[in-house]
């Protein structure tokens, strides 16, 4: 473990990231005194167990009277010598720290073997004042513990900000980040060390738990980090896919599930989720289920079977036609004289949800949902039907990116993937027009603009908070924009009841975007 390695290496200090002892984010759990007291009790035990080794820095919640702090505890000789309290509390996007924590005063440096160390906690290093104060009070090295979750492009922003802090204060900095999934968020690791001139001395890999030793040498110009390992930096396609795999793997582990199942439609969304599930859990732990109706084409049946074969995952078929007819017969006296509409379509979807949840309960397998961000945005899904499930790996992936990600996966394989090499999503699935197959000759484009147009409008309206007028200026038809806007707002109630899913962007559904369910405002300018 990390402590044993640090002792073996003769390290002066073993540094862990922010809130490492409890995980991050703990949300309102830190408002429970029993939780914080338990964390502090474990911290005391940990300090005693590690009394003969190096100084340890570790993130932990701290209660002081009626105040609760996001703290960084420094352990030496079996004792807690200080607990640094986070000063800047983020209160935007997924962060609600002002709701659950109190702001601490800026803390001065602590001493490790005669060297003065300053530890700005995460957000404290995003602004100049804390690091500046640490430098002015004698800090010689900065060690910044972080719980920084992934979004596309986040790593580049971290590097840029930390280079600024190092150069501004003429101090080397070690940036430590958590690794792993917590609900919808993934902490992507990628810890690094930079010198006072902004040069990178060490880069740890993204998405992997790792332990590295870094040596600092004193020079006439101050301490300098010696050159260490520099992990390669994956492109954004690999990062996104790895995040979806890690999010599912950790969510399953932390909620006690070892196996997953999902409904296969023969379409691209379920095929991609199946690939992610196999890469996260291994194909032997994934059950695929085809639930055909009279509207399901033979091509869909063949494509689903072919995909399962490429993934080396078992697939089972449960026809729903008899169940569907039985429900219609039961409702016939009440529906008499009424035309068929989306009611009958939704009954099919809910029957599938019913059967899949039955399998989930019986075999203790987590049911995965497969709605992409485009569908989740406009409510192109059936509540208590295909929305039924425990986790959605592609919830923050627009449809156009679903196609691109599927092509990427077919052409790429890495050691962290537990699934099959090579093509895992048949080209026939990627090429065919999307359809829900809930009525004859149905296509998604019957109800929605083409996905290139839909995704473009959604990115403006939702991701960038653009106005309807902005969308029209960008070249989109007013009728399309108003239609998408209407669906976006009307679908809020569905999203409140949807499964959690991997956060990939700066505007994912849940904590990044909080809208009322009942509100009639529309952008009519």
PLM region spans:
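Enzyme catalytic cores with a strong preference for nitrogen-chemistry domains
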Residues: 1-263, 274-285, 290, 315
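ATP/NTP-dependent adenylation/nucleotidyl-transfer catalytic domains that generate, transfer
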Residues: 170, 196, 223-266, 270-525
